[in-house]
Amino acid sequence: MTRLAIALGDPAGIGAEVVLKALAHRPSLNPLLVGCRQWLQASYEQLLPCCHEPLADPSQLEILDEPLTEAITPGSISAAAGAASFGWLTRATEAVLDGRAQALVTAPIAKTAWHQAGHHYPGQTERLAELCGCDDAAMLFTARSPQSGWRFNTLLATTHIPLSSVPAALTPERLERRLGQLEDFCRRFRQRPRLRVAGLNPHAGEAGQLGTEEQRWITACLQAYQQRHNNLQLEGPVPPDTCWLGAAQAWNDSQHVEEGCDGYLALYHDQGLIPVKVLAFDQAVNTTLGLPFLRTSPDHGTGFDRAGQGSARGASMLAAIDTAVELG
């Protein structure tokens, strides 16, 4: 079985809670948790009286101990918490790279806390890419429907940048690289995958009336890619407002799984994350492609407003753990 390293995320958030809730459902796993042993044990003892779900006992888990340097207040953003989560991610990544684990699961971090600690990265994905010496890591969100069993895969061509910066960041070279990553991932599940690419502009440009990128180069880029890769079905650019309609049908009804594509390529962050979160909020898993190992993360944030209360749901973290075991 794939051994996981699990970085515990921002200690002021819900990372410890969702990890312990998820691991309570997978007692046969032998993960390596990376964080502060004393803090994790204290969090467990604080959660026990108010939590209505089972929790894994940290004393029964292997922990790579990286102690906190100062006290952390649940729900409060701080440089100390940012420094801790940054260090825990680094140590967990090193554990995978040196063979102590085969895949990485990361609990959520707060970018503001990282910045306060002097670590100016857009997110964990970019730090992981740096640690691994990779310059082209990509964010893919995957989920399996509990209603139909269909697997929903959406990859982002661009990630944490302002919307105004997307047209310049979106180049033919980037689009082709992202298509290649999506194709490779989807071949795990189907030999001849069907991929769909959303347009950049409303109605995919409306023949140049609402934007020109589709006419100027996106359509030609997709056609050229299809010609070079004939063992797939490539659709696009598809008007964004209808691109994921088939995904909704496939997600909700096992009789319509063929309406969904094997993979979707969104051209910017919210274009892809809106359908993912509408359909699969508790099931979606953030998966990083382009690293020398598989990394997954739950598709939610630090949950500062719920920290220490026992009310956080562990379903998305459990999905992240299961996905890492399955695909890692």
UniProtKB/Swiss-Prot annotation:
InterPro entries: PdxA, PdxA_fam. Substrate binds at T125, K277, N286, R295. Pfam families: PdxA. The keyword Translocase does not apply. Pathway: Cofactor biosynthesis; pyridoxine 5'-phosphate biosynthesis; pyridoxine 5'-phosphate from D-erythrose 4-phosphate: step 4/5. A divalent metal cation binds at H160, H203, H269. One of its GO terms (biological process) is pyridoxal phosphate biosynthetic process. Its EC number is 1.1.1.262. The keyword Cytoplasm applies. Its main location: cytoplasm. Its cofactor is a divalent metal cation. GO terms for molecular function: 4-hydroxythreonine-4-phosphate dehydrogenase activity; metal ion binding; NAD binding. Binds 1 divalent metal cation per subunit. It catalyses: 4-(phosphooxy)-L-threonine + NAD(+) = 3-amino-2-oxopropyl phosphate + CO2 + NADH. It comes from the Bacteria. It is an enzyme of class 1 (oxidoreductase). One of its GO terms (cellular component) is cytoplasm. Homodimer. Belongs to the PdxA family. Catalyzes the NAD(P)-dependent oxidation of 4-(phosphooxy)-L-threonine (HTP) into 2-amino-3-oxo-4-(phosphooxy)butyric acid which spontaneously decarboxylates to form 3-amino-2-oxopropyl phosphate (AHAP). The active site is located at the dimer interface. This is 4-hydroxythreonine-4-phosphate dehydrogenase. The gene is pdxA.
